[in-house]
Amino acid sequence: MGLARALRRLSGALEPGNSRAGDEEEAGAGLCRNGWAPGPVAGNRRRGRFVKKDGHCNVRFVNLGGQGARYLSDLFTTCVDVRWRWMCLLFSCSFLASWLLFGLTFWLIASLHGDLAAPPPPAPCFSQVASFLAAFLFALETQTSIGYGVRSVTEECPAAVAAVVLQCIAGCVLDAFVVGAVMAKMAKPKKRNETLVFSENAVVALRDRRLCLMWRVGNLRRSHLVEAHVRAQLLQPRVTPEGEYIPLDHQDVDVGFDGGTDRIFLVSPITIVHEIDSASPLYELGRAELARADFELVVILEGMVEATAMTTQCRSSYLPGELLWGHRFEPVLFQRGSQYEVDYRHFHRTYEVPGTPVCSAKELDERAEQASHSPKSSFPGSLAAFCYENELALSCCQEEDEEEDTKEGTSAETPDRAASPQALTPTLALTLPP
């Protein structure tokens, strides 16, 4: 797509009559607002995800020179990264090859000494080893320390003794490698990501009088994620003023790195907030522009597993169609007696906030600057009251559901439980002027 645009631009530049059109096309491609790709490129077809919703990267490597040699140079990491079935097959073949190699060695030593001849010598190198199968069984018993007591090595042949010593050393090294690789693979925090979840959608709404992009993260386990922190990047195609086409330009999305709010205490689900300011790549996007935009928001959660102290990383992504403008997340944290309760039924649910501005954050800032000398606040008080009452109603509905479940489960209630538990309602995030 970018190559075709570059060829069209180049052909237009070579034709004298189309020089002005080529300049206009180049200016439109390179100097479009906020660096977005032109409308025909972004509007014809949505590009595939770079990072899937489950965190897997949608990338395939091709034409790698010397790929096998590079993987074998770091054999331990290769064994840890491969699937279990290939790992088990590799280790089984390694043990089998070791037994066959030393069995063949013992058979050759016995054959050269004459132990396999029709009249066996009075002092053989190996007792009860008269064939290749017997030599293979002797190698197996030696490396695994089975010790049936039938076959053994004698002091007649120093070469046989040296071969037995060499097999013991090689067997110890192979066992250590196999045990280390299996333990490292079992201790990988990859499966820990299954209990770290992101919300299905992200939302764009006002918070503290600023337009913010928000999404939720949650931990389904009781064990904590130590030193948990979040990051986000915006991936989008871009054409530089020089005409270079970048298929995926990575832009950092600030989630509070300077203030330290990117480091989270993930005991209950937390809403990650990105304030859309002048440094944000979404600063010039309103609701209409967002629907036509072509980008991918990649969100990352990192931390150390409490049980193993190994670092884990959980990833997900959001497309423009998954950013809900003018929505907020439903409350998930409620107080039940002396404990707090997290209801994951509401984790992915959102509700619409009427009156949310549909313009971009840039236009909001311009309007706020124009109305800065006005004594009245431009933010309606009825909207703030609705937001608070809406979240309060959600908490009350949660209380009613709990009360109905309690009444159905028990015929009589104690006086302590007669009073309905008080829900932990979110505090009003918007302070209205008097």
Swiss-Prot record:
It is found in: Membrane. Disulfide bonds: none annotated. GO terms for biological process: potassium ion import across plasma membrane; regulation of monoatomic ion transmembrane transport. Channel activity is regulated by variations of cytosolic pH; channels are activated by alkaline and inhibited by acidic pH values. Inhibited by Ba(2+) and Cs(+) in a voltage-dependent manner; sensitivity to those inhibitors is lower than in other Kir channels. It catalyses: K(+)(in) = K(+)(out). Belongs to the inward rectifier-type potassium channel (TC 1.A.2.1) family. KCNJ14 subfamily. This is ATP-sensitive inward rectifier potassium channel 14. It comes from Rattus norvegicus (Rat).
